[in-house]
Amino acid sequence: MSQVTFSDVAIDFSHEEWACLDSAQRDLYKDVMVQNYENLVSVGLSVTKPYVIMLLEDGKEPWMMEKKLSKAYPFPLSHSVPASVNFGFSALFEHCSEVTEIFELSELCVFWVLHFLSNSPNSTVEAFSRSKKKKKKKKKRQCFAFLIYFRLGIKMGKQGIINKEGYLYEDSPQPVTMEKVVKQSYEFSNSNKNLEYTECDTFRSTFHSKSTLSEPQNNSAEGNSHKYDILKKNLSKKSVIKSERINGGKKLLNSNKSGAAFNQSKSLTLPQTCNREKIYTCSECGKAFGKQSILSRHWRIHTGEKPYECRECGKTFSHGSSLTRHQISHSGEKPYKCIECGKAFSHGSSLTNHQSTHTGEKPYECMNCGKSFSRVSLLIQHLRIHTQEKRYECRICGKAFIHSSSLIHHQKSHTGEKPYECRECGKAFCCSSHLTQHQRIHSMKKKYECNKCLKVFSSFSFLVQHQSIHTEEKPFEV
């Protein structure tokens, strides 16, 4: 089952869109983005810190990333297999055996993508619409080009470019439904059933900054000459934003079936981070990271370390940003108010979560059982039920738990701590849920009272039986 990524819950704003937001809406956006990232980090689903999070933590505006990121120039890919053949990503490794890890931004032909979409009917995608720009001198037929982001994709190929005839388009990104993309793709396939596709020669996406793309060299081991028509167009700014994720230690994707390679001249400068190996590996779960600092933050998931302590209440946190958000609760300030019921919240993300109770919207659906959730964090917690993953282990007895809250409750059994005391009888409990359950005993005792003798019963049926004594009725007499 595919994992949730930060991009599944991320929202991108252009400079113009950001300018339309007021200060409260911007604060809400920042809170939601940071909380979603921390939720993913807490369960080990986010490997590198997204650039937008770094900007937000530095107090910068998120649209500034558009200026920093590099431009992308993918080149075409095609296949000789007809559309009726069932493609899968296993076939990709047959064509490109050296593949060890695929970029989140990679190039796919139309049939690869159609197969992937058909096997992920619940995925949501973002696509680039067809460009209206056409070169007058070139009469080559220009096709659709979609930059697809697979919301619930597999670990490899989470993003891809559909290039049906080997040409790339540039236009403003428009979010569309998967159904619309599939419909357009199938319309193209049905109207071009007799098209011939050449064998897969290469599968590579490369990114560079302030440079031009050189023509690939024809160094095929089979001696075949391959001519690549590359449109030197820039992806729109939002697509460039997506390409930022390659700078987190991802490996370049190479193919040994073709000798085609980019000319390593001054005209092409690749970021060093693209070729960097993931050398920092977690000894507990085997996950690899590009930076020692990221591994250190990840390690806190296993150790339970919470180095950031609140001076007001002593509560500890694993991340500094979590402590900052927590400290707002002590100030008593609640600037985020629900327009439906008037309830106020100290964090914008809390308001967002609360508003789902009014709308009833549950957009996050479990692929295993179909259960839906209003928040992605709830879905992540639920998924552990299916995987039976128990990542929270007690250091004292070794017992493992699915949820961190269960571990916290369990640890109190070792310490003997019972902070929850009943006001009625003084009995103490280690968990608030146990106290709530106990308090029902007191409330039930005072619930049903006989108006004749003032005797109290814990249930209505007992009261009815008792009242038969006063009326001299014998309801159970044969």
From Swiss-Prot:
Cellular component aspect of the GO annotation: nucleus
Domain KRAB: 4-75
Residue spans crossing the bilayer: none
Cross-link (Glycyl lysine isopeptide (Lys-Gly) (interchain with G-Cter in SUMO2)): 183
Entry's localization field: Nucleus
UniProt-listed InterPro entries: KRAB, KRAB_dom_sf, Znf_C2H2_sf, Znf_C2H2_type
Similarity annotation: Belongs to the krueppel C2H2-type zinc-finger protein family.
Protein name, UniProt field: Zinc finger protein 302
Species annotation: Homo sapiens (Human)
